[in-house]
Amino acid sequence: MAHTMRVEVVSAEEEIFSGEAEFVALPGESGELGILPGHTPLITRIRPGAVRIKIAGQAEDEFVFVAGGILEVQPHGVTVLADTAIRGADLDEAKAAEAKRLAEEALVNKESKIDYAQAQAELATAIAQLAAIQRLRQKR
């Protein structure tokens, strides 16, 4: 069995990460997923949260925030097709906190004509982004 696998993290806008990795952890729809080289093929939806990539030969893990998407696992590679993806180093805590505040206000305001499902999705994404920022801080 190989010790590394090819990992691709892409969004509609750009390729966020492409390289060899020893391990990938990410938030699956049913819970946290850990992928090692040679993993059984799998296609599943992913929830908003942090993707942690253990890069071969590096002490520091790579972090990418994804706002949901699809995970495809093949024996020699992993592809994350994210709705939105942001490199861990590019996460903006103030912006995420403001998005959370606005989504909470929209859900509380009974007189506004909002799409509650959309507001709830935006709130979940903002909360997941803030949690990813906290995780990234703990790792450093």
From Swiss-Prot:
The keyword Transferase does not apply. It holds the Pfam family ATP-synt_DE_N. Its main location: membrane. The keyword Transport applies. Gene3D superfamilies: ATP synthase delta/epsilon subunit, C-terminal domain, F0F1 ATP synthase delta/epsilon subunit, N-terminal. It is found in: Cell inner membrane. GO terms for molecular function: ATP binding; proton-transporting ATP synthase activity, rotational mechanism. Keywords: ATP synthesis, Cell inner membrane, Cell membrane, CF(1), Hydrogen ion transport, Ion transport, Membrane, Transport. It is a peripheral membrane protein. One of its GO terms (cellular component) is proton-transporting ATP synthase complex. Belongs to the ATPase epsilon chain family. Produces ATP from ADP in the presence of a proton gradient across the membrane. NCBIfam families: ATP_synt_epsi (TIGR01216), PRK00571.1-4 (NF001847). F-type ATPases have 2 components, CF(1) - the catalytic core - and CF(0) - the membrane proton channel. CF(1) has five subunits: alpha(3), beta(3), gamma(1), delta(1), epsilon(1). CF(0) has three main subunits: a, b and c. This is ATP synthase epsilon chain. It comes from Herminiimonas arsenicoxydans.
